[in-house]
Amino acid sequence: RAEIVAVIPFYMTTLMRMMAGLLAPDEGSLRVLGLDVTRDAQAVQDRISYMPQRFGLYEDLSVQENLDLYADLHGVPQAVRRERFARLMAMTDLARFTARPAGKLSGGMKQKLGLACTLVRSPELLLLDEPSVGVDPLSRRDLWEILLQLVRDEQLSVVVSTAYMDEAERCAHVHVMNAGQVLANGTPQALAQRAQGLTFVATPPDGMAARMLQARLLDAVSTVVDAVPRGGRVRFIRRPDVDEEA
């Protein structure tokens, strides 16, 4: 089913590597696209694309050369490359940088190039491990617009691990996990309903940026679960076992 699913786990990278068939579970089992990732790892890898946090771009190669290299690695036929590359370039706004070395791109554009290289072979399922970490807010917004376009236009299914609640809100389903166990799952709206009475909005005092207030709230680990800037204010979630006066 074409949609974006968010996973909010501890040990995010470990889970994503297991889903990609790169790491076997210590115990239990895991199925992706109906396949057992331990027994059918190669079959899983043939149908998915995986973008880790540190995607392996070749910084001395140009944007176009990186795309060509990954197309070669994935066996993308020459007959479909021109159209596929043109579409990826248009979506990521990389068309004007085709001759630029990847190492000369901004952080946000590098992430877009990594995504384009991941998508050269039109996978059934895309796995993204915290794709917006270290990316500026504008590039982060652009990245999510690209993902939504892929789901809409190409019927692509996406699983994304993220620690950002505002990103999870843009997904069709959210799974909150810890130590391999699902703590909660459902639509963002359903999970938000469960948090009713635990979610608050704080306004920074004069002279304080929302990001600074967010940092202070996140430092209060005994009382605050998460805090996200939103429109100059900060929305935060209080731990359910803490008195409201705390």
Positions of predicted regions on the chain:
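Catalytic Walker B motif of ABC-type/P-loop ATPase nucleotide-binding domains
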Residues: L126-D129
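Conserved ABC ATPase "signature" region
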Residues: D68, D72, A79-F97
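Conserved catalytic motifs of ABC-family nucleotide-binding domains
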Residues: S122
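Helix-to-loop junction immediately C-terminal to a conserved catalytic motif
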Residues: A20
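Conserved ABC transporter NBD signature motif
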Residues: G28-R39, A43-V44
